[in-house]
Amino acid sequence: MENTETSDEFLYKMSSTLRKGLAEVQAKVNALYRVEELEEYIGVKDSPIEYIQAALAPLIGQVSDFQDYGETVTSRMTLNLEEVDVYAMLDSVMTIADQLLEQKSGVTLEEEIAEELPIIEADPLRLTQALLNLIHNAVKFTDKGFITVHIELEPENILFEVRDTGIGIAEENHELVFQPFQTILADKDDPRLGFGLGLKIVEHIVDLHDGESWFESEPGVGSSFFFTIPL
């Protein structure tokens, strides 16, 4: 038990340090955009600045996942609860989702949003993170068809669903889905291979809100990931 706690603490501190360092590098790269002599490189595909920017993005994302996971296992993750307008939150989520889909020309992003959703008490940043993690996961495993964000009002909850027409998940792999550092991919060189932390973080965020999370999936048909936030 003590070794596990020590490892979790190390993971949290390591990811925090890496995240800070990468953020400083990102700030320096952003500063280059304001240097007049470098204007010819801005927005040019494969230019040094754009290459660095593109390389930094997934690294920062992975390190952020590590830090968030470290917060879950060391009980550091807390919520800053406030009144949340789901429609306003969704506007920002869908803007980012559109950017995630820029390289997926065969995939259409759809919305199915209930009318007259009430204001809820939640952590808007964590709620946004949970929804974006599900969308990012759908984008990663969907090459054609649709990704649908569905939100509906239930008697005691708001139900969030991200549905895709991706590769789906075999039944024997269902138990791995919310486990950290697990993958459903057999090919260890698959570019979609990550650390398996995104869905675990979603589960923890939802748990902190006293909600529930689950999924349904069929190979070759697609997947639907759900979570609820109490009213």
Q: What is the predicted function of each stretch?
A:
Residues 138-139:
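Short helix-loop "hinge" at the ATP-lid/N-box region of the Bergerat-fold HATPase_c
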Residues 80-95:
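A conserved beta-strand-to-alpha-helix junction within the catalytic ATP-binding
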Residues 210-211:
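Conserved glycine-rich
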Residues 54-59:
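Short alpha-helical segment of the dimerization/phosphotransfer core of two-component systems
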Residues 169-181:
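Short conserved segment of the HATPase_c
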Residues 73, 80-84, 104-118:
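Conserved catalytic submotifs in the C-terminal HATPase_c
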Residues 99, 167-168:
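Glycine-rich G1-box
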